[in-house]
Structure formats: structure tokens, C-alpha cells
């Protein structure tokens, strides 16, 4: 008797399980949420309606001083400034295929489980990687590490690097200052990420920058306290250190370069993030499709997602991202 590869009930079961398992980013899920107070805002506006364009409102900080006592409020209200960014979604799919009925007749369920697990991992890692690429692309707000010298803000952040310009605790503090008090009026203030009434920012650094940071005496001093380790919020999970309310996280997929300092300095493009630094726009849940091929002998499984990842911008300026260029110890050498 022939093996029945699938039924509509089985396909729906696996579709729901895949949609649940693959519905979030992997590493960057700790920074993502539906609120405009998340570093990566998840927008699902197209789940219930047709279309390919999602409009995201970028929320600016209120700057007014308010009124005191019985002074008149009418006429002294502050305009709520919002800017709109359009994000166009597209479809991404990937699939796997079984070897055949003879190979799978005793392990059909295992094949589906393996397909779900591997496609979930592939989508999670793909989204993480793509988001880092998007956030790193063509930065308009930058800081170049400068070992004890004058900070290089925007100008020569990468080209001015020398091998000694590794990550420092002082630079992390400077990044926060640049977020809250931009050095030029063309840069909007970067709103913090809210958690339990506190304001935080995130700095995502590469593995080599993390290595350099951990070997510094300043890092070891901060680690004597490590108060954040008891925090249950995902934002704090695996944070390497917290500097002046900047949560430092390590991610091995951070962009690297070998042409710093003009041509020879190896380093990384680390990412400082505030609220609404990026957008994860989704046009629906992950899809799961099964069909037989080779005249019913093999099962093909395809996972898909309609989405787009984007870095937010205000008047062509990065809205809540600062690229932090550092020289690093080349661990691949």
C-alpha cells in the first residue's frame, strides 16, 4: 500500500507549528517588539489587508518646557512631530526535499520535523544577518575609535583608524552622549529603549571587539558588580556589560573590514541602537507548503515569509543608529 505523504490536516498542523517557531528573529529578537519604544519595531499592518507597502510613523522626542502653575496652556501646546517612512515588503522562500519513499517510509514524521527545524534556523539566521547588513549600510552617523585622542565623529571614522584604536568604555559613554545630545542640529535625538521606567540603549559589537573589550582593565572593573544578570527582560539576556545604561551585546555576524586607516587596518562596524532604529515589516505569518515530486516519490517542503527589514531614516539621516568603527584584534589570522 502506498505511503500517503500528506493531508490537508497534516499540512495545516505543520504550517501552524512552523509559523510559531519561525515567527521571530533569533539573536535580535531581544531587541524587537511591536512598540515604537523597541529598538527593532515589528509592524504587522498587512496581515489583515492586501498591499505591499507599510507606512511606519517615526516618533520624535518632545522638546518643549511645558507650563507651570496656573499659566495658560492654550496656545502653548507642542506639535506632536511624526515622520513617515514607507517600507515595501517582498517574499522570501526556501525549501527542502526528501530522498524518496524507500528512504523515508519509516521516518516521514522525522523528515518533517527536521525540515521544520532546519528551515526555522535558516530563516532566523537569514533575518538576523540581513538586519545587521541593513543597519550597517551607508551610515550617516558614525564614531571612529581613537585610542585616547580626539573623537572622530562622522568624518574619517573609518579611514582615520590605526591598529591601536580598539573599543573602549569611554567610547561607549560617548556614543550615549551623541544619542542624547547630537553634535549637529541635522541629527535627531535618539530616543532610548524603555524598561521598567529606565532608559537604555544597545550596542551590538562583533566577536573581535568583544575580545578586545574583555581584555581591558575598565571592563573587569565593571564586571565586579554585574547587577544586570538578574534581570528577566530579554533585553538584558547575555549582555556582556552595561555602561551608563548602554547594554553591550556580542553578535558574531557584525560586519568586518580590512581597509580601515586608508587600506590596512582590520576592524568591525559595531552598531549603537536606540528606539525605532530598524523596522521588521511583515505581510503575514510564515507559510508552509508541501507537494510531491518525482511522481509522488519525494516530498518537497517550502517555507516562506513576506517581509522587509529597513533602517529608519529622518531627512536622509539615520534616525536611531550610530555606526561605531573600531580596529580589532584579527582572530582569523
What are the roles of these predicted feature ranges?
Residues 61-64, 101, 120, 124:
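Generic short alpha-helical segment signal, independent of protein family or function
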Amino acid at each position: 500500500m502506498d505511503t500517503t505523504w500528506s493531508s490537508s490536516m497534516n499540512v495545516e498542523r505543520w504550517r501552524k507549528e512552523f509559523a510559531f517557531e519561525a515567527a521571530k528573529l533569533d539573536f535580535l529578537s531581544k531587541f524587537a517588539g511591536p512598540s515604537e519604544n523597541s529598538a527593532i519595531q515589528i509592524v504587522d499592518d498587512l496581515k489583515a489587508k492586501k498591499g505591499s507597502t507599510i507606512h511606519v510613523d517615526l516618533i520624535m522626542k518632545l522638546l518643549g518646557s511645558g507650563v507651570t502653575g496656573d499659566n495658560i496652556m492654550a496656545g502653548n501646546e507642542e506639535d506632536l512631530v511624526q515622520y513617515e517612512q514607507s517600507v515595501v515588503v517582498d517574499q522570501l522562500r526556501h525549501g527542502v526535499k526528501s530522498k524518496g519513499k524507500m528512504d523515508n517510509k519509516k521516518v516521514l514524521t522525522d523528515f518533517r520535523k527536521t525540515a521544520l527545524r532546519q528551515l526555522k534556523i535558516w530563516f532566523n539566521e537569514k533575518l538576523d544577518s540581513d538586519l545587521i547588513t541593513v543597519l550597517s549600510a551607508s551610515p550617516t552617523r558614525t564614531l571612529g575609535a581613537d585610542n585616547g585622542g580626539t573623537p572622530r565623529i562622522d568624518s574619517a571614522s573609518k579611514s582615520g583608524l590605526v591598529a591601536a584604536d580598539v573599543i573602549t568604555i569611554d567610547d561607549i559613554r560617548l556614543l550615549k552622549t551623541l544619542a542624547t545630545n547630537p553634535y549637529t542640529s541635522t541629527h535627531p535625538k535618539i530616543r532610548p529603549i524603555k524598561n521598567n521606567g529606565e532608559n537604555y540603549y544597545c550596542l551590538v559589537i562583533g566577536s573581535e571587539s568583544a575580545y578586545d573589550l574583555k581584555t581591558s582593565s575598565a571592563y573587569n572593573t565593571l564586571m565586579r558588580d554585574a547587577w544586570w544578570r538578574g534581570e528577566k527582560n530579554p533585553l538584558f539576556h547575555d549582555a556582556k556589560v552595561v555602561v551608563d545604561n548602554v547594554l553591550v551585546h556580542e553578535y558574531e555576524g557584525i560586519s568586518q573590514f580590512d581597509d580601515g586607516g586608508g587600506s590596512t587596518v582590520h576592524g568591525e562596524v559595531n552598531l549603537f541602537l536606540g528606539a525605532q532604529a530598524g523596522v521588521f515589516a511583515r505581510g503575514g505569518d510564515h507559510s508552509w507548503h508541501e507537494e510531491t515530486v518525482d511522481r509522488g516519490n519525494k516530498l518537497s517542503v517550502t517555507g516562506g515569509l513576506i517581509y522587509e527589514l529597513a533602517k529608519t531614516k529622518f531627512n536622509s539621516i539615520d534616525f536611531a543608529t550610530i555606526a561605531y568603527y573600531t580596529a580589532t584584534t584579527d582572530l582569523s589570522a
